Amino acid sequence: MAKRINRAIELLEQNQTIYYDGGHTGHVLTYEQGLKDAHIWADYINVGMEHGSFDMAGLDQYIRGLIDGGPTKSGHRTPAVIVETPVEGSSEEIIRFNAWQFRMVLARGVHGILLCQAETPDAVRAFIESCRYPINMTGVGHGLERGTRGTGSQPTSAPVWGVDADTYVDKAEPCLTLVVF
């Protein structure tokens, strides 16, 4: 039985190396591909939207295929899905102007976002704040301000994780994978 919803976090907590599959120029985002990828060898699936299509309808279908094709061999409902967004992380302003993309991606129920070209501490801080709920006060006043992610996406994201809306809000905040390169 899986200890975490996100296998990548589960392995990192055990000081294990994690491996991914998926290109940086797009991914086949169909229900059928989700069925195929449900038993992928990798610890997480990278969905490259930085250089690929920003396709939320396709991402919805793909994740539905992962759910219907699951669970994984490790007992997780789906493989972890981490999306590279097409937002350049070079400044706080760019992040804040494009935060809607993070909200859209997270509303699909993905397990994390990879911010490409994170070039300044202010950009990284703005990214984290954009992905966090305002109700979570951890770190606020110690380098972070309140989160700006709205709490209206649980009807779509919680079922992906196999939990109710309140549980999603509790679990999404501390285990959301924010990968910054």
What are these regions (language model features)?
Residues 1-181:
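Expand to "…catalyze enediolate/carbanion chemistry for C-C bond making/breaking, isomerization
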